[in-house]
């Protein structure tokens, strides 16, 4: 039973992942959440746009807690492998779409530009900080961080396109090796 707004976010997230922003009709959202339009608007007076913004904020919060903060604060020798494990788990070994990435490529990019930009900037910044604390020069750390985040996004696309989770695992192993190399 849905008791509060946060209870709806997992179902909303999956609707947006599976159908995109434009394809996520209120009827479909209602069907997947079990809520009528009145209840949806009670939780999200701004409608579908507010729903998507809340989902993006929830994703950002999860990544802040499980990936960004550890990369900024923990020993990089633990944080980088931890990032790889967390990313693999979150994206279900490449079987789950990166919703932020999908929004970045879609027609809704401009509508959610700040959230999209913030997510990818926070990820590359946190990873670069960790790599720099681990001994890489600032420019090299930034380059590897950008390369890694881009490679993760590409690995997600490839794993989904090929319906081959093993390709995601292999890519993540290569990314980890590259990030932990001197």
Where do the language-model regions lie?
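Amphipathic alpha-helical packing segments from all-alpha helical-bundle domains
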Residues: 64, 109-135, 143-146, 170-180
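Amphipathic alpha-helical segments used for helix-helix packing
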Residues: 52, 79-82, 91-114
């Amino acid at each position: 039973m849905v008791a509060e707004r946060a209870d709806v976010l997992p179902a909303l997230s999956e609707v947006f992942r599976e159908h995109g922003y434009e394809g996520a009709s209120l009827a479909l959202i209602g069907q997947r959440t079990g809520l009528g339009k009145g209840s949806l608007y009670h939780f999200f007076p701004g409608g579908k746009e507010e729903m998507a913004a809340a989902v993006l904020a929830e994703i950002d919060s999860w990544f802040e807690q499980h990936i960004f903060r550890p990369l900024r604060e923990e020993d990089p020798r633990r944080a980088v492998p931890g990032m790889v494990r967390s990313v693999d788990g979150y994206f279900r070994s490449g079987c789950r779409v990166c919703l932020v990435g999908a929004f970045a490529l879609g027609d809704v990019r401009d509508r959610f530009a700040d959230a999209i930009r913030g997510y990818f900037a926070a990820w590359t910044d946190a990873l670069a900080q960790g790599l720099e604390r681990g001994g890489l020069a600032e420019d090299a750390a930034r380059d590897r961080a950008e390369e890694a985040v881009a490679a993760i996004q590409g690995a997600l696309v490839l794993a989904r396109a090929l319906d081959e989770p093993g390709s995601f695992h292999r890519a993540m192993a290569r990314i980890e090796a590259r990030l932990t190399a001197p």
